[in-house]
Amino acid sequence: MKKEKLLINAKRVLKNSYGPYSNYTVGSVLVAKDNKLFLGCNVENAGIQSICAERVAFTNAISSGYREFKEILVIGKNKNDKYLKETLPCGYCRQFMCEFCDKDFKIITYNEEEKTFKEYKLEELLPYNFNL
């Protein structure tokens, strides 16, 4: 999948993000094995734990019957509405991804200032995942 197409979709869904407590907004685009796209944005709540954009995209895909994935692109903004140089999944999201993705699953970040993409394998970001 072309990264530019993923970026356009990530920026679009980022606008729906709800982050009034952390002032940190995130958008993500998950790509299934058949190239279907699933979007996600973070949603914060004062009363319970928030849900990250990556897990929103995954649960959207899983509830639609998908279980096999190729890659995800993640972007974020800070409280000043400036794009972050790199937005990486939190530890909880990394472990969540391990449930559904192999070690070569790609995590793509984007640096808006430099107009560059960076790719990681899931295994690089979580080399020792929890397993039952």
Q: Each predicted region: which residue ranges?
A:
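Short capping/connector residues at structural and topological boundaries
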Residues: 26, 48, 127-131
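C-terminal binding/interaction regions
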Residues: 2-16, 66-132
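Hydrophobic "anchor" residues
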Residues: 36-37
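Compact, glycine-rich, soluble single-domain proteins
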Residues: 41-56
